[in-house]
């Protein structure tokens, strides 16, 4: 599961928030060819999707499988 953000700063803010909540994340290149998104995103286990979505509810992102 990939959490794709518009700004790189949001990737790092989301990473910190999720890791502080016990969710393992990995910063990886964005798999989306859409130029609207920044070049990196967060890779998160699919079983953490619901918890991650709740924690990031105030951020602007897109989930890509």
Predicted regions, residues:
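C-terminal structural segments of small proteins and small subunits
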Residues: 30-33, 37-65
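Low-complexity, intrinsically disordered short peptide segments enriched in small/polar/basic residues
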Residues: 1, 8, 24-25, 60-61
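Short glycine-/aliphatic-rich beta-strand segments at the starts of folded cytosolic domains
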Residues: 1-4, 40
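Short amphipathic alpha-helix segments
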Residues: 6-22
């Amino acid at each position: 599961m990939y959490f794709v953000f518009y700004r790189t700063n949001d990737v790092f803010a989301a990473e910190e928030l999720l890791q502080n909540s016990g969710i393992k994340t990995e910063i990886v290149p964005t798999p989306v060819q859409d130029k609207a998104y920044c070049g990196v995103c967060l890779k998160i286990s699919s079983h953490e999707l619901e918890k991650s979505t709740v924690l990031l509810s105030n951020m602007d992102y897109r989930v890509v499988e």
